[in-house]
Regions:
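Signature of soluble extracytoplasmic/periplasmic domains of secreted precursors
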Residues: 1-206
């Protein structure tokens, strides 16, 4: 799978962790990657899926299913078990399964089919951050050119005990009751071998 991604995807990568309507299910996770040639990338992915060794308890018919929306049916590919999704996103998932589909000229990867369908539905309904007031307010102080950017509700991050929270510096954990009231925007720009951080905290009531 890593070789497939190296040959078919570009340098633009977006990792999303968002709440489902049923909070008992835990957050949904999706990795979105730019693709150089969608038709060729999908042809190669289909071949990869069809020629992969069969897993115990699964048949070939379950390797390709569909995500149905009011306007289109998207093929969903069940990939061989791998830790690559966790390596690329740092999202610790209980399953090694990865599901893939193509949407809007991009390759979407997720640990479950439900995450993919919810992500596509949000995009179809134009439920994106670009138009959100909190997003615009937080990015006003950031550069238009960057190599990495993170936006996260600090309260949600601190609730991910055993998952993403181990990446949070100890200072924020010690003062978690204070920082859970903020939205975190972190941006990193690389120039001449130097990494320049830019961090903005926005109070949620604003």
């Amino acid at each position: 799978l890593s070789r497939y991604l190296a040959e078919n995807t570009g340098q633009d990568l977006v990792a999303c962790l968002f709440q489902r309507e049923d909070s008992l299910m835990g957050p949904a996770a999706v990795l979105s990657l730019s693709v150089m040639d969608v038709a060729e990338a999908e042809r190669m992915l289909r071949s990869l899926v069809n020629t992969a060794p069969a897993e115990e308890g699964t048949g070939r018919n379950s390797r390709i299913t569909f995500c149905y929306t009011p306007s289109k049916a998207y093929p969903v590919y069940r990939l061989p078990q791998t830790t690559l999704f966790t390596q690329l996103t740092s999202f610790v998932e209980p399953s090694l399964h990865v599901f893939a589909t193509f949407y809007g000229g991009r390759l979407l990867l997720a640990p479950d089919e439900d995450s993919l369908s919810r992500y596509i539905r949000h995009l179809d309904n134009d439920e994106v951050l670009d138009g959100a007031l909190a997003y615009r307010a937080g990015t006003d102080g950031l550069s238009d050119s960057y190599h990495f950017m993170l936006m996260a509700d600090f309260g949600h991050v601190l609730e991910q005990s055993g998952h993403q929270v181990h990446y949070v510096p100890e200072f924020f954990l010690r003062n978690s009751e204070f920082f859970r009231n903020f939205i975190l925007f972190a941006q990193f720009t690389c120039a001449d071998g130097v990494v320049y951080p830019n961090i903005v905290l926005k109070y949620k009531s604003e």
